[in-house]
Amino acid sequence: DAIFVRSEGVQFSTPWHQDEPYWSVKGFDTVSIWMPLVDVDKKSSLAFVPGSHRWDKNYIQQDFGELNPDNEEGVDTVNFEGEWEKFPDIDSNRHEFNVISWDMKAGDCVAFNARIIHGGGGKLSSGRDLKVFNTQWLGKDVRVNFKPYGMDPDHSVKMKNAGMNSGDKVDGSIYPEFTI
């Protein structure tokens, strides 16, 4: 779970990315839930490339650890260099990629697969801030997958201490398990 906060006047867009490559897991049955705690204009809201979670592509993701203007210690970093390909130029071709986003009221939610390409507009209107609660959910096909390029957040130590190894099912010993 995470809370994202941007102060009034911030004009920073969250780069296009997918969530799963950052995580210590791999699997298709994943859901991220993004819930603004304040009203959000469409231009500031999360935007998506519909259907991109079904593309069989690995893209070079943004290292969010680089976005650390205060140079804080212990910030998780990743390095996606190597066999991954660059993201397509979505911003210059938004219509071609059918990019979608919405005005959202406080408490509205959008749920999406962790492999879908998404990013934040980040263009906050005058007098507006952005506060978002985000949570991730994992399904039965999801397995532990420690990644050599790093993870953000990096739960690998916690998972290894709980006896989990790459290929194992993520169990409820450190992550709550819900039966629906």
For the regions a protein language model found, what residue spans apply to each?
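Non-heme Fe(II)/2-oxoglutarate
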Residues: 61-64, 106-111, 115-180
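Glycine-rich loops and low-complexity Gly/Arg-rich segments
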Residues: 22-29, 39-41, 57-62, 71-75, ...
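Short, surface-exposed loop/helix-turn segments at secondary-structure junctions
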Residues: 18, 82-95, 127-129, 148-153
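Activation segment
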Residues: 7, 57-58, 120-121
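A short beta-loop-beta micro-motif enriched in histidine and acidic residues
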Residues: 19-30, 97-98, 104, 128-129
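Conserved hydrophobic/aromatic beta-strand scaffold that supports enzyme active sites
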Residues: 2, 32-36, 99-101, 109-111, ...
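Double-stranded beta-helix
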Residues: 42-117
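Conserved double-stranded beta-helix
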Residues: 1-48, 53-54
